[in-house]
Amino acid sequence: MVFSNNDEGLINKKLPKELLLRIFSFLDIVTLCRCAQISKAWNILALDGSNWQRIDLFNFQTDVEGRVVENISKRCGGFLRKLSLRGCIGVGDSSLKTFAQNCRNIEHLNLNGCTKITDSTCYSLSRFCSKLKHLDLTSCVSITNSSLKGISEGCRHLEYLNLSWCDQITKDGVEALVRGCRGLRALLLRGCTQLEDEALKHIQNYCHELVSLNLQSCSRVTDDGVVQLCRGCPRLQALCLSGCGSLTDASLTALALNCPRLQILEAARCSHLTDAGFTLLARNCHDLEKMDLEECILITDRTLTQLSIHCPKLQALSLSHCELITDDGILHLSNSPCGHERLRVLELDNCLLITDVALEHLEHCRGLERLELYDCQQVTRAGIKRMRAQLPHVRVHAYFAPVTPPTAAGGGGPRLCRCCVIL
């Protein structure tokens, strides 16, 4: 529908400004910018700061430069509560200093992938943005411990901080952070490879409200650090230890005895964990919903039996490369309350003992949405077809190597690779 100038003028006269602003508040960035071009009146309405409380510039990341952020900050001022600059690699410290000065009520700021920023940006946020609750600095590789010291002094209401792949961070930075930001509920430290057990001890001492911690690829972390962490963070609900390859059942025991609210555990490539540790965990953590046990190569069907008995809320389970898992383990899982009612995702890549019999058992999992079967060499196309006849909504991901062409009788004749045969 196309409005004439008379129509637009009538709308402006009939509806009060407050109602028009309310209507404009439901529009996205692109639509607001289009409305701003209709008339002077609509330009004022569309660009009113109250309509720009939440801005996500990810879809425009290649076009966003520092001046764009500065202009937005001047227009929005104290109205802006949430800004995402994820992937905006053209934005640097100077622009974010202007932003921090103008938008002092900002609560949620995403700088994921803004690789130009340095500690200077964090100093600006610390100085001007005391209401900040959520900060994402993923892959801001120039960030150092100095940033964390600044944040701890000026952003004491911080609840969520993502420092993934900021690999200059050490235990000293973590100590400075948690001393000042004791209300942290989520701390993501993926790829912070310099962190050691002492960093976890600092978290244990000060972050008693912590519910989510990601330590993926923090390979220097040992059982001692995890044990200390669990003792000080009893509210922990999500923990990623994937790639912390030295951990043993002592870590699982600490989780089982101290963190009964645990819902998500990612322990991929923790190859020393065994059935004994997961048995104790299952018997104490009944709220488990998601588990990534990829390459926990020592676990057997016993772990699945315990999960099926004690963890009725389990929704997603990765057992890729757990080569001791058999059809019997899948039977226990499928016949359990979680199998019947909750299980949505099951990953069995490279589980070499799994056969079509396991797929028959999985037909009982009526809620199953995705099944990974790559390189399960005893699973057949026919078995998958039978299962999908019972579960037509399930997405099955599997790979079957192309059949090798038979060798010509007598070995004579030209030999063609399969690519050439296809062509």
From Swiss-Prot:
Pathway: Protein modification; protein ubiquitination. It comes from Bos taurus (Bovine). Keywords: Calcium, Calmodulin-binding, Isopeptide bond, Leucine-rich repeat, Lipoprotein, Membrane, Phosphoprotein, Prenylation, Repeat, Ubl conjugation, Ubl conjugation pathway. It is found in: Membrane. The lineage of its organism: Eukaryota, Metazoa, Chordata, Craniata, Vertebrata. GO terms for molecular function: calmodulin binding; phosphatidylinositol 3-kinase regulatory subunit binding; protein phosphatase binding; ubiquitin-like ligase-substrate adaptor activity. Pfam families: F-box-like, LRR_6. LRR repeats lie at residues 61-87, 88-113, 114-139, 140-165, 166-191, 192-217, 218-243, 244-269, 270-295, 296-321, 322-350, 351-375, 376-401. It comes from the Eukaryota. A lipid is attached at residue 420 (S-geranylgeranyl cysteine). Residues 9-55 form the F-box domain. Part of the SCF (SKP1-CUL1-F-box) E3 ubiquitin-protein ligase complex SCF(FBXL2) composed of CUL1, SKP1, RBX1 and FBXL2. Interacts with calmodulin; may antagonize substrate ubiquitination by SCF(FBXL2). May interact with PIK3R1. Interacts with PTPN13. One of its GO terms (biological process) is regulation of inflammatory response. This is F-box/LRR-repeat protein 2. GO terms for cellular component: membrane; SCF ubiquitin ligase complex. Calcium-activated substrate recognition component of the SCF (SKP1-cullin-F-box protein) E3 ubiquitin-protein ligase complex, SCF(FBXL2), which mediates the ubiquitination and subsequent proteasomal degradation of target proteins. Unlike many F-box proteins, FBXL2 does not seem to target phosphodegron within its substrates but rather calmodulin-binding motifs and is thereby antagonized by calmodulin. This is the case for the cyclins CCND2 and CCND3 which polyubiquitination and subsequent degradation are inhibited by calmodulin. PROSITE patterns: FBOX. Residues 80-90 are annotated as: Interaction with Calmodulin. It is a lipid-anchor. SMART domains: FBOX, LRR_CC. The modification Phosphothreonine is found at residue 404. InterPro entries: F-box_dom, Leu-rich_rpt, Leu-rich_rpt_Cys-con_subtyp, LRR_dom_sf. Phosphorylated by GSK-beta (GSK3B), promoting recognition by FBXO3, leading to its ubiquitination by the SCF(FBXO3) complex. The CAAX motif is a signal for the geranylgeranylation of FBXL2 and is required for its association with cell membranes and the recruitment of substrates to the active SCF(FBXL2) complex.
